[in-house]
Amino acid sequence: MKQILVIGAGRSAVILIDYLLNESSKCGWIVTIADYNLELAESASLNHKNSRAIFFDVNDYKQREVEIKKSDIVVSMLPSNMHLIVAKDCLNFKKEMCVI
């Protein structure tokens, strides 16, 4: 199964997360929803069987490394000033990334 990492579970992410989860079964996706606010990530995951909600501190290099390496694609829903830190890791680990 393809691993999709969505970093950020705020209001603008909810529609994308809902779409990814709705398509996950037929497309073979596991969607990890990562946010500093675990309750927000859990709420966005909708307890879907193909979702995983995690606490995520974008400033924690080790955690970024672990989660990005596990992923096939990374979607950054973070504020624009935080995209660069994620983008650099995606380049280093040769992972696809998109910013929405």
Predicted regions and their residues:
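ADP-ribose/adenylate-binding Rossmann-like module
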Residues: 89-100
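Conserved Rossmann-fold cofactor-binding substructure of NAD(P)-dependent oxidoreductases
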Residues: 56-70, 82
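Hydrophobic/small residue at the entry helix of a nucleotide-binding pocket
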Residues: 12-16
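Helix N-cap at the beta1-alpha1 junction of Rossmann-like dinucleotide-binding domains, i.e.
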Residues: 36-40
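Conserved beta-strand positions in the Rossmann-like core of class I SAM-dependent methyltransferases
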Residues: 29-32
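Beta-loop-alpha module in the N-terminal Rossmann-like domain of NAD(P)-dependent dehydrogenases
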Residues: 73-90
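Conserved N-terminal Rossmann-fold NAD(P)-binding element of oxidoreductases
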Residues: 4-11
